[in-house]
């Protein structure tokens, strides 16, 4: 039975270009999941957009001496150019700078305000007398009170993932001038998170299908007790408050950005000329998945669900399959720390499927994972080229050369051949299960294992020898290997859409796998074929040194 799946993906801050951490953490797993469900025949809506607001952008603008709008627009355009190169198949990608988003965020604010879930309070906020302004979020740095990490910021600690208030930091200082701020009174609006504590605990306790790290982090956080959080800031960049008298304040970026999932869905519906079409993705038995890196967990398992509970009538997350960090030398890739490997740069030298393969096979699903150029080259050469690509190339070239560019007659199948076909069908069942449960590494491992199995079959049968004595036997071996390839193109499709599309045409099927289904399709005897080009290119070992030198390690 087909399902309806909503996929929300973290909104990247438009303060820098994309690095491999973003891809491995959020965008690639979301895209794999979307492509998989579309191929299964499910209805999918995958949305996100650039986060144009917040202090990461104003800080960058101040550093460069340009406006925040200019910074945000520049990186938004770069993201838009990167997505197709990466093969990220958005149903809709927008930004938080739209009038639709501001309106949706303001409506959410007012709805929660009217129900008493948002209230006003006077608080002490850090104020730098040297810079003469309040210091929101990332304008303050200091030591995390929980894990003692020294580079924690006024909104969150990147090391232990806990959201923070500036006043909780130890040894806090102004990011701009390094002086310790004083605390001054200012009025802010608060989200009454405490009102949702019990409902949230009851809800999270039913989420036994969540990843252990996500579930444990969330429960620990909830059981420490929820504090109400300020959701406005003294800033002039962001979505204005929908109430008169607060012109110098804006909605806090984290309250506002998560609303993007809803506003993007509405904008998608409007763009299709069906303004109500978003509703079916936010109600009924639609399952909502949110793909994010682990620093975003509390915003998606606590704050956003609390907002949705308060508003009512909209689906809560079904799953939040958050990834851990992609690291270099055990440090989180970070724009701000400048230790990143940039997506556009990598894609200017290597194929997109090589990158997607490495990041899928080494995805930081359950622990932080170091990116390694040695692994990049090894997996490309040993697995993509020697195991999978070579299998396709050997089989299809022989078929084209010896059987007049047509899928050959295979006659009667022997035991060994039937076993490979059965294993291929079983692999599709197992990858289906793994992908359904967001076990991406497991799924891609299963597919590559079948490619190895098909190579063993081919080496045993040796059609290049058979053909000299028994052309019909060689035809059978090659046909059965084509059946395995037919299964592989489906299983690899969510991960490696470019090469799967090509393999699909080489096998005589169309290139649009999403129009098929997650089953083993047999190549059609007599179908005309075009001789194949290699699916992947071998990389020189020198790539490891060149790239490591480029990173300055
Ligand atoms: N090294 C990483 N590994 C895994 N996920 C990451 C990594 N860096 C960022 N992400 C995820 O990518 C998404 C978008 O990131 P965002 O633009 O918010 O950057 P960020 O986390 O502030 O990164 P930075 O530290 O580079 O400024 C978020 O869900 C974030 O968790
Ligand atoms: Zn200062």
Curated annotation (Swiss-Prot):
It is found in: Cytoplasm. Its cofactor is Zn(2+). Its EC number is 6.1.1.10. The keyword NAD does not apply. Binds 1 zinc ion per subunit. The keyword Ligase applies. One of its GO terms (biological process) is methionyl-tRNA aminoacylation. It catalyses: tRNA(Met) + L-methionine + ATP = L-methionyl-tRNA(Met) + AMP + diphosphate. Keywords: Aminoacyl-tRNA synthetase, ATP-binding, Cytoplasm, Ligase, Metal-binding, Nucleotide-binding, Protein biosynthesis, Zinc. SUPFAM superfamilies: Anticodon-binding domain of a subclass of class I aminoacyl-tRNA synthetases, Methionyl-tRNA synthetase (MetRS), Zn-domain, Nucleotidylyl transferase. Zn(2+) binds at residues 144, 147, 157, 160. GO terms for cellular component: cytosol. InterPro entries: Anticodon_Met, Met-tRNA_ligase_1, Met-tRNA_synth, Methionyl/Leucyl_tRNA_Synth, MetRS_core, MetRS_Zn, Rossmann-like_a/b/a_fold, tRNAsynth_Ia_anticodon-bd. A motif ('KMSKS' region) lies at residues 332-336. ATP binds at residue 335. GO terms for molecular function: ATP binding; metal ion binding; methionine-tRNA ligase activity. NCBIfam families: metG, PRK00133.1. Belongs to the class-I aminoacyl-tRNA synthetase family. MetG type 1 subfamily. Monomer. Is required not only for elongation of protein synthesis but also for the initiation of all mRNA translation through initiator tRNA(fMet) aminoacylation. This is Methionine--tRNA ligase. It comes from Dehalococcoides mccartyi (strain CBDB1).
């Amino acid at each position: 039975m087909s399902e309806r799946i909503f996929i929300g993906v973290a909104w990247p801050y438009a303060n820098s270009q994309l690095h491999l951490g973003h891809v491995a953490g959020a965008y690639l797993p979301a895209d794999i999941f979307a492509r998989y469900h579309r191929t299964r025949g499910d209805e999918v809506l995958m949305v996100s957009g650039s986060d144009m607001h917040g202090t990461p952008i104003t800080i960058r603008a101040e550093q460069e001496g340009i406006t925040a709008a200019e910074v945000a627009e520049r990186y938004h355009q770069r993201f838009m150019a990167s997505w197709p190169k990466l093969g990220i198949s958005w149903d809709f990608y927008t930004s938080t700078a739209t009038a639709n988003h501001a309106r949706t965020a303001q409506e959410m604010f007012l709805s929660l305000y009217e129900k008493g879930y948002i209230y006003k309070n006077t608080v002490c906020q850090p104020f730098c007398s040297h810079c003469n302004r309040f210091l929101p979020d990332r304008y303050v740095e200091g030591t995390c009170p929980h894990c003692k990490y020294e580079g924690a910021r006024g909104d969150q600690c990147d090391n232990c993932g806990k959201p923070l208030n500036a006043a909780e930091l130890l040894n806090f200082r102004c990011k701009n001038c390094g002086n310790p701020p004083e605390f001054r009174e200012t009025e802010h609006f608060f989200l009454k998170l405490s009102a949702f504590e019990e409902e949230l605990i009851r809800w999270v306790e039913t989420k036994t299908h969540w990843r252990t790290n996500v579930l444990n982090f969330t429960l620990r956080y909830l059981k420490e007790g929820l504090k109400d959080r300020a959701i406005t800031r003294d800033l002039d960049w962001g979505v204005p408050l929908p109430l008169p008298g607060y012109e110098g304040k804006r909605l806090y970026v984290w309250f506002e950005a998560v609303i993007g999932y809803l506003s993007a869905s509405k904008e998608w519906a409007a763009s299709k000329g069906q303004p109500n079409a978003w509703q079916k993705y936010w109600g009924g038995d639609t399952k909502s998945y949110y793909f994010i890196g682990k620093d975003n967990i509390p915003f998606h398992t606590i704050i956003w669900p609390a907002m949705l509970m308060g508003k009512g009538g909209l689906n809560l997350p079904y799953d939040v399959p958050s990834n851990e960090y992609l690291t270099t030398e055990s440090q989180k890739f970070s724009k701000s720390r400048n230790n990143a490997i940039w997506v556009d740069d990598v894609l200017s030298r290597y194929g997109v499927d090589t990158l997607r393969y490495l990041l899928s096979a080494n995805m930081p699903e359950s622990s932080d994972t170091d990116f390694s150029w040695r692994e990049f080259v090894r997996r490309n050469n040993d697995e993509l080229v020697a195991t999978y690509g070579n299998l396709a190339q050997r089989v299809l070239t022989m078929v084209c050369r010896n059987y007049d560019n047509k899928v050959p007659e295979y006659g009667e199948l022997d035991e060994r051949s039937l076993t490979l076909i059965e294993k291929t069908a079983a692999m599709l069942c197992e990858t289906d299960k793994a992908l359904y449960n967001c076990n991406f590494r497991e799924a891609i491992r299963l597919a590559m294992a079948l490619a190895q199995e098909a190579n063993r079959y081919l080496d045993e049968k040796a059609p290049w020898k058979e053909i000299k004595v028994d052309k019909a036997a060689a035809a059978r071996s090659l046909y059965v290997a084509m059946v395995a390839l037919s299964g592989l193109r489906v299983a690899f499709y969510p991960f490696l859409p470019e090469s799967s599309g090509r393999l699909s045409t080489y096998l005589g099927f169309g290139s649009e796998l999403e129009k098929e289904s997650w089953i083993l399709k047999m190549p059609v005897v007599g179908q005309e074929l075009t001789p194949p080009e290699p699916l992947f290119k071998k990389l020189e070992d020198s790539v490891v040194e060149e790239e490591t030198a480029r990173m300055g390690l």
